[in-house]
C-alpha cells in the first residue's frame, strides 16, 4: 500500500517529497498544493478535512478549501453518510433536522412564548389561591416581546402580607400596563413603581420569587397563616394522635399495642 501511495504521489509536489510527511490529504493522494508557502496558508482551512481524513478510504476525489470534501461517485470512494453536495460542512450541519432554530430568530420564539403564556395562565387560574407568582421567560430573546402580557407577573409581590388567616390576594390587583401592583391585607399594602418592580414590605420574611431558577414553575412558598387556617378548619388541632403516624410501622406491633391499651378498659367494664 505504501508503494502504491508513493507511485500516486510521485512527481506531484515541486519540493521533491512524496507527500507522506505532510497534510493527511497528501497521504490520500488528494492534495494539489503548489508550494509549501501555499500549504501553510491553506492549513487552517483544512482542519475539518484533517479530521475527516481518518474515516475516508483511499480513492479518487478532490479537495476544495471552500466546500470541504466533495466525494467523487467513482469506484473505491465512500461517501461516509454525507450527501455529495457542494455545500460547506458547517452549512450542511446547520441545515440538519436534529438542530433547533437559531437563538437569534424571532419568528419561532414568539409562538413558543405565546403557547407558554397560555399554559401559565391556565395554571394560575386553576390555582387554589390567587397568588401573584413570578414566571420568568424561558426564552432569553423573547423577553422584550411579551412585556405587555407578562408585566403583571413581574410587578406583583410573590406573597401577600397580612394579619388575617385568609390570603390577601382578594385585595390586591396588578395592572399589565406597567403602573405597578398593589397587594392588600390586614397588615398593610405595598405599591410598586412604574414597570420597575414592587418594593417588598418588612413583614415578609420569604425569599423573593424572582430569585427562583427559571425551570422551577411549581415551587410555592408555604404561608403559615393559610396552613393554620386549614388546620383549624378541618379540626386537626383537636386530634391528639393522627392515624397517619402509624403508617410505615409493622402491623403486628400496631395490633399488639392496640390490644394492650384496650384490655384495662375491658376489665374495668
UniProtKB/Swiss-Prot annotation:
Top-rank lineage group of the source organism: Eukaryota
Compositionally biased tracts (Gly residues): 165-198
Keyword Transcription: yes
Gene Ontology MF terms in the entry: chromatin binding; histone acetyltransferase binding; LBD domain binding; RNA polymerase II-specific DNA-binding transcription factor binding; SMAD binding; transcription coactivator activity; transcription coregulator activity; transcription corepressor activity
Entry keyword annotation includes Nucleus: yes
Family to which the UniProt record says this protein belongs: Belongs to the CITED family.
Protein's recorded name: Cbp/p300-interacting transactivator 2
Organism annotation: Mus musculus (Mouse)
Amino acid at each position: 500500500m505504501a508503494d502504491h501511495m508513493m507511485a500516486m504521489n510521485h512527481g506531484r509536489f515541486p519540493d521533491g517529497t512524496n507527500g507522506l510527511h505532510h497534510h493527511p490529504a497528501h497521504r490520500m493522494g488528494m492534495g494539489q498544493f503548489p508550494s509549501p508557502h501555499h500549504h501553510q496558508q491553506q492549513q487552517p482551512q483544512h482542519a475539518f478535512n484533517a479530521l475527516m481524513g481518518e474515516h475516508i478510504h483511499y480513492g479518487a476525489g478532490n479537495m476544495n478549501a471552500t466546500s470541504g470534501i466533495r466525494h467523487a461517485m467513482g469506484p473505491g470512494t465512500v461517501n461516509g453518510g454525507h450527501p455529495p453536495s457542494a455545500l460547506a460542512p458547517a452549512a450542511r450541519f446547520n441545515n440538519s433536522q436534529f438542530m433547533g432554530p437559531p437563538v437569534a430568530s424571532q419568528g419561532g420564539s414568539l409562538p413558543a412564548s405565546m403557547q407558554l403564556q397560555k399554559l401559565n395562565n391556565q395554571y394560575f387560574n386553576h390555582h387554589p389561591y390567587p397568588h401573584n407568582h413570578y414566571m420568568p421567560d424561558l426564552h432569553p430573546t423573547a423577553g422584550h416581546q411579551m412585556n405587555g402580557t407578562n408585566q403583571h407577573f413581574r410587578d406583583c409581590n410573590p406573597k401577600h402580607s397580612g394579619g388575617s388567616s385568609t390570603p390577601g390576594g382578594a385585595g390586591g390587583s396588578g395592572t399589565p400596563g406597567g403602573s405597578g401592583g398593589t397587594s392588600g391585607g390586614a397588615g398593610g399594602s405595598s405599591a410598586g413603581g412604574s414597570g420597575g418592580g414592587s418594593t417588598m414590605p418588612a413583614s415578609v420574611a420569604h425569599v423573593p420569587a424572582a430569585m427562583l431558577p427559571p425551570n422551577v414553575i411549581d415551587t410555592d412558598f408555604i404561608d403559615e397563616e393559610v396552613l393554620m387556617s386549614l388546620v383549624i378548619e378541618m379540626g386537626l388541632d383537636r386530634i391528639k394522635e393522627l392515624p397517619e403516624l402509624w403508617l410505615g410501622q409493622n402491623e403486628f406491633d400496631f395490633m399488639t399495642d392496640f390490644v394492650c391499651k384496650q384490655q384495662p378498659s375491658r376489665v374495668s367494664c
